[in-house]
Amino acid sequence: MSRLRAPVAKFLADGLKGIRSTALAGSRLSNCRYTSTSSKDTDTSSHMTHFGFKDVPEDEKEHLVKNVFSSVAKKYDEMNDAMSLGIHRLWKNIFVSRLNPGNSTVPMKILDVAGGTGDIAFRILNHATNHNGDRNTRVIVADINPDMLSVGLRRSKKTPYYDSGRVEFIEQNAEILDKIPDNSIDMYTIAFGIRNCTHIPKVLEQAYRVLKPGGVFSCLEFSKVYPAPLAELYRQYSFKILPLLGTIIAGDSQSYEYLVESIERFPDAKTFAKMIEDAGFTLAGETGYETLSFGIAAIHTGIKL
């Protein structure tokens, strides 16, 4: 393991060890590259997958998911506030602080996938700059949806990172990432995005491919709530209240219904950790994950050794 990656891997392994639960890039930014890649490069028309609770052909899911996020792009923060009762902001801060970007003497290259609005990327750069004095670490924001990327690009103009060379927005499919070379990334992050992908094992395979040896994969995603009475209360809120809020916030109840259903269909933390391990990663700590807010969300971390 390189001298750069070893401290990061050790930090994450030590930082997550024993934690079961808690109360809870380089082109100029002015040119947002829309380099599109699609899973439709291969014929999947004979295979079915889930879109929320519905079964749909695999080659249709990508289009359906794109429509959802195009619909909610301008209200994305409000959507996350509704789905997490506002706690997603704290979760994201925890997520980034666990990674501690910029903690190396060598600038890092970080890939944030499904991060079109820039929310995680800006937090990463703020942490690297303000906590670690690192003004050279860069983030590539990759998202399949140009509407989400447009939101991120617009927001970047209000940050110190606009036109700085430290952040880049590109349109990429998480299952392909053909613009990202092998063994080129120090950290790979994905927040509230992987459950919307058609083939999660392919996403994990690509994450493993692009990471350097010693590189870190970290995923923040909704998970399974516990104990059972709280889980049922949260489920009732999700299925009865959230679609109504979707109508009020974005004039779109159907997109919110899908997002709730996608959470319900996503594997529990232990199962997802096994998927990460099966992709070749070494799980950080005892379990490879940390649950937040009684399991509403979880942080999963793996290391490419």
Curated annotation (Swiss-Prot):
Residues in the signal sequence: none
Functional note: Methyltransferase required for the conversion of 2-decaprenyl-6-methoxy-1,4-benzoquinol (DDMQH2) to 2-decaprenyl-3-methyl-6-methoxy-1,4-benzoquinol (DMQH2).
Lineage, top ranks: Eukaryota, Fungi, Dikarya, Ascomycota, Taphrinomycotina
Protein residues bound to S-adenosyl-L-methionine: 117, 143, 173-174
InterPro entries per UniProt: SAM-dependent_MTases_sf (IPR029063), UbiE/COQ5_MeTrFase (IPR004033), UbiE/COQ5_MeTrFase_CS (IPR023576)
Family indicated by similarity: Belongs to the class I-like SAM-binding methyltransferase superfamily. MenG/UbiE family.
Gene name in the database record: coq5
Keywords associated with the record: Membrane, Methyltransferase, Mitochondrion, Mitochondrion inner membrane, S-adenosyl-L-methionine, Transferase, Transit peptide, Ubiquinone biosynthesis
Species name: Schizosaccharomyces pombe (strain 972 / ATCC 24843) (Fission yeast)
HAMAP family for this protein: MenG_UbiE_methyltr
Subcellular location: Mitochondrion inner membrane
Catalytic activity, reaction form: 2-methoxy-6-(all-trans-decaprenyl)benzene-1,4-diol + S-adenosyl-L-methionine = 5-methoxy-2-methyl-3-(all-trans-decaprenyl)benzene-1,4-diol + S-adenosyl-L-homocysteine + H(+)
Membrane topology designation: Peripheral membrane protein
SUBUNIT field: Component of a multi-subunit COQ enzyme complex, composed of at least COQ3, COQ4, COQ5, COQ6, COQ7 and COQ9.
Protein name, entry field: 2-methoxy-6-polyprenyl-1,4-benzoquinol methylase, mitochondrial
GO biological process: methylation; ubiquinone biosynthetic process
Any one GO molecular-function label of the UniProt entry: 2-methoxy-6-polyprenyl-1,4-benzoquinol methyltransferase activity
